[in-house]
């Protein structure tokens, strides 16, 4: 059954909602276009009513674009394309408002947008901008008055400028322009030109224009506020980081400026910048004036600073941020150096003005280099230069910034940011009175940087070498419980007998560094402290691995030495029975101190640190390296993922840190001789006790005596290489000697000093003799007294004596060779003297193969 035309019309009149929905779907421009038989696009003018029907859809699309896109140009471009269709305008353009050198202007961002335009074709690159001052053109008038302007005929408009038409070969007839405001501030101007279906834009067009521009206004406001927020954030970061660096260097303006400018380079948003430092001398020295007074040279006639100083740049620091970062320091630069040749820095130093140059190549006042500056092909495009002024309002330097990274000219926000930086740096010049207070902090900074450079914490992959939870359980150690980790470690650790960690003759020569890490973990299990003090097993593994990485890869004082000291401490406690005097907590601290005692050792001794004026020597007055090792160990323990003390209570934690302080500082051999007599007194005192149990009970309660014994144990551990079997000790001795010789080389080349014989590789043949002297003077006492103290330690003393015999034999052999050489030289000298005497007494003269005496 079909409906008549009248019935259909009546139904639609009675059901307006259905009619609206039906025709909205069926009569969209796209469907109408598809229905065209000839395939031609529909006439936009005839579809004006349909466009209005589709207005809600268009607005929805714009809102979606605003949500999905963070690109301002892309969103505004879509708005302008839609406006071209709705207004029947030939094209639309976007002009962004900005300020340079205190002068406001409008620059094209999107130009000649048409309904079928592509964003890339309409987006104006920075070097092709059309710029209007506010006193030129209709767009400038709109920005000044902050009101919409509808120009029906540009020929009758006094504000119209044909400048853009001449550049683009276009004829503007009429236009509609409106400002985009953020409060009272102009953000941009949007303009539509040349009505296609009428002589000019109507009031209805103005309403549509404003309606759709609400979306553009909203997005441009967001963009503008985001830009201002970004600028303020950058400014805050610049001031924060420059303040950080300024207060690290308070004695030298050059280093102060360099550190600050280099640190904030990422926030300056430019490709290159240079800092010219001005000579602050107001009066010349007498010997410089004489040549002028004598008429031998002309007086200075160049520009001067506002306070009357001659403008002389004594140094230029050039920061290259494009391509490979580079810093070039040019002392006493010539006037034709590229950074000065334009005359801009001198002008800024003379006038104190901020100069913002949009197009350097076209500037008439300053002559910038037109071609590429270097092999990289870098060109000067735009420049921002400003003075650095101190609190006395003296210009101390000029900072010049080149080429904003996004290609646009520097704007008002860039000027504010750079001025904040230069102003702060200028004021900071007067802060040198705080140098003494900051000196120690400066040294700490240098040391912290050095620590970071050489220390890398155990990462997620490295821990799998010891705790392979991924392979075993398919998850990370952090996701495993302690029982699971314990089972894995039980299988992965070598056990106490594999490498003889209970033995005094232990040798690391057959072990890898990873084996030593595993042995270190095993020692904590053997001490029974893992379960007792609830050490997280993942933390224990990370700690040992990080300790091993904290040791530098040097000849002797490396991770192997650090582990050997800890293993000897473990052996003295367990095999040597010294554990009977100490609690589990104290043994825990002592083994840890052994592991940390030489961490980050540099291969040079304390005396070298002082001679070379190393920051460590300035930071620590005595036991320089030992205090640094202690601080490094504490630094690692302060990290939660490495803190094996994390489950100790406050009193326990204070106690272990106190013991570590004593144990590590005690490895300074300069202190060894101070404690020898006290240790010997304790050993003698132990012999007065017939009952060993009573002695153990007595000493266990004597805190001071226990600390003295512990300090001497650290010395015995540190020197324990001398007590190893000869085949091990002879190799280790060569490693020690090699490291000493390396220090001797440094003293000879860097310090220009003659090293002592022990560190002079030219006297390497004297090593056996030096070893015998070292054993007699330093080592014999400590191991002899420990063997008296506990007979279980006697093997160390016996091997020491055996090694002395070996070194003595080598020393005697060397002495015999030296003596034989000396005797031979003496015989030759006597023989030569005898021949000379015979000649003098009339004896036969020696025959010569080169001359004949007649």
UniProtKB/Swiss-Prot annotation:
<feature type="active site" description="Proton donor">
    <location>
        <position position="557"/>
    </location>
</feature>
<feature type="binding site">
    <location>
        <position position="561"/>
    </location>
    <ligand>
        <name>a divalent metal cation 1</name>
    </ligand>
</feature>
<keyword id="KW-0716">Sensory transduction</keyword>
<keyword id="KW-0140">cGMP</keyword>
<dbReference type="GO" id="GO:0007601">
    <property type="term" value="P:visual perception"/>
</dbReference>
<comment type="similarity">
    <text>Belongs to the cyclic nucleotide phosphodiesterase family.</text>
</comment>
<dbReference type="InterPro" id="IPR003018">
    <property type="entry name" value="GAF"/>
</dbReference>
<dbReference type="GO" id="GO:0047555">
    <property type="term" value="F:3',5'-cyclic-GMP phosphodiesterase activity"/>
</dbReference>
<feature type="binding site">
    <location>
        <position position="598"/>
    </location>
    <ligand>
        <name>a divalent metal cation 2</name>
    </ligand>
</feature>
<keyword id="KW-0472">Membrane</keyword>
<keyword id="KW-0007">Acetylation</keyword>
<keyword id="KW-0378">Hydrolase</keyword>
<dbReference type="InterPro" id="IPR036971">
    <property type="entry name" value="PDEase_catalytic_dom_sf"/>
</dbReference>
<dbReference type="GO" id="GO:0097381">
    <property type="term" value="C:photoreceptor disc membrane"/>
</dbReference>
<keyword id="KW-0460">Magnesium</keyword>
<comment type="function">
    <text>Rod-specific cGMP phosphodiesterase that catalyzes the hydrolysis of 3',5'-cyclic GMP. Necessary for the formation of a functional phosphodiesterase holoenzyme. Involved in retinal circadian rhythm photoentrainment via modulation of UVA and orange light-induced phase-shift of the retina clock. May participate in processes of transmission and amplification of the visual signal.</text>
</comment>
<keyword id="KW-0966">Cell projection</keyword>
<dbReference type="GO" id="GO:0019933">
    <property type="term" value="P:cAMP-mediated signaling"/>
</dbReference>
<keyword id="KW-1014">Congenital stationary night blindness</keyword>
<dbReference type="GO" id="GO:0043153">
    <property type="term" value="P:entrainment of circadian clock by photoperiod"/>
</dbReference>
<dbReference type="InterPro" id="IPR003607">
    <property type="entry name" value="HD/PDEase_dom"/>
</dbReference>
<protein>
    <recommendedName>
        <fullName>Rod cGMP-specific 3',5'-cyclic phosphodiesterase subunit beta</fullName>
        <ecNumber>3.1.4.35</ecNumber>
    </recommendedName>
</protein>
<dbReference type="InterPro" id="IPR002073">
    <property type="entry name" value="PDEase_catalytic_dom"/>
</dbReference>
<dbReference type="GO" id="GO:0060041">
    <property type="term" value="P:retina development in camera-type eye"/>
</dbReference>
<feature type="propeptide" description="Removed in mature form">
    <location>
        <begin position="852"/>
        <end position="854"/>
    </location>
</feature>
<dbReference type="Pfam" id="PF00233">
    <property type="entry name" value="PDEase_I"/>
</dbReference>
<keyword id="KW-0464">Manganese</keyword>
<dbReference type="InterPro" id="IPR023088">
    <property type="entry name" value="PDEase"/>
</dbReference>
<dbReference type="GO" id="GO:0007603">
    <property type="term" value="P:phototransduction, visible light"/>
</dbReference>
<dbReference type="InterPro" id="IPR029016">
    <property type="entry name" value="GAF-like_dom_sf"/>
</dbReference>
<keyword id="KW-0479">Metal-binding</keyword>
<dbReference type="GO" id="GO:0005886">
    <property type="term" value="C:plasma membrane"/>
</dbReference>
<dbReference type="GO" id="GO:0004115">
    <property type="term" value="F:3',5'-cyclic-AMP phosphodiesterase activity"/>
</dbReference>
<dbReference type="GO" id="GO:0046872">
    <property type="term" value="F:metal ion binding"/>
</dbReference>
<comment type="subunit">
    <text>Oligomer composed of two catalytic chains (alpha and beta), an inhibitory chain (gamma) and the delta chain.</text>
</comment>
<feature type="domain" description="PDEase">
    <location>
        <begin position="481"/>
        <end position="814"/>
    </location>
</feature>
<feature type="domain" description="GAF 2">
    <location>
        <begin position="252"/>
        <end position="429"/>
    </location>
</feature>
<feature type="lipid moiety-binding region" description="S-geranylgeranyl cysteine">
    <location>
        <position position="851"/>
    </location>
</feature>
<feature type="modified residue" description="N-acetylserine">
    <location>
        <position position="2"/>
    </location>
</feature>
<keyword id="KW-0225">Disease variant</keyword>
<dbReference type="InterPro" id="IPR023174">
    <property type="entry name" value="PDEase_CS"/>
</dbReference>
<feature type="binding site">
    <location>
        <position position="597"/>
    </location>
    <ligand>
        <name>a divalent metal cation 1</name>
    </ligand>
</feature>
